[in-house]
Design a protein with these regions (language model features):
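N-terminal beta-strand motif that seeds the catalytic metal site of vicinal oxygen chelate
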Residues: 1-15, 68-70, 120-127
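Core segments of cupin and vicinal oxygen chelate
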Residues: 4-48
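Vicinal oxygen chelate
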Residues: 5, 28, 82-127
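Acidic/polar helix N-cap motif
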Residues: 9, 74-77, 110
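Short amphipathic alpha-helices within nucleic acid-binding modules
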Residues: 16, 76-84
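Short hydrophobic/aromatic beta-strand element in the GNAT-like acyltransferase core
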Residues: 36, 50, 69, 105-107
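Conserved, structured core segments of small domains
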Residues: 45-56, 103
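Acetyl-CoA-dependent GNAT
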Residues: 53-58, 121-123
């Protein structure tokens, strides 16, 4: 899976995605009219997809359209990510929803105004 997200402030978006998901970045690609940052999973983001942050007059942040759902491994990791979201300029705009069967889910806006989601899964204890 590869994700491309439009941004208006590349430095701010880099801080957000590094801080929330532990992604590491590669050198910037300057491909006029776009400036592109590629972020890759690190040890702290085991199942995170690769992400490109694109600053371009052809791409605009949005809270509609396709919804990208980032998965973290534990409910504790979900709570830690939500703390980082708030600290790095994002907005959590729904409560964490317990979807049953050990799944939790929440919607938010990143620091650029893109709507994304977070989910976590922990197996339920055996009865």
């Amino acid at each position: 899976l590869w994700i491309e997200l439009p941004v208006s402030d590349l430095d701010r978006a880099l801080r957000f995605y590094r801080g929330v998901f532990g992604l590491t970045d590669t050198p910037l690609y300057d491909e006029p009219p776009a400036l592109i940052a590629v972020l890759l999973p690190s040890d702290k983001a085991l199942r995170a997809p690769g992400v490109s942050l694109i600053k371009s007059p052809l791409h605009h942040p949005a809270d509609g359209g396709a919804l990208v759902n980032f998965h973290v491994d534990t409910h504790q990791a979900l709570e830690a990510a939500l703390t980082a979201v708030a600290a790095l300029g994002g907005t959590v705009d729904t409560p964490v929803i317990d979807m049953g069967d050990g799944v939790r889910y929440v919607n938010l806006l990143d620091c650029e105004g893109n709507r994304i989601a977070l989910s976590s899964y922990e197996p339920l204890p055996e009865e």
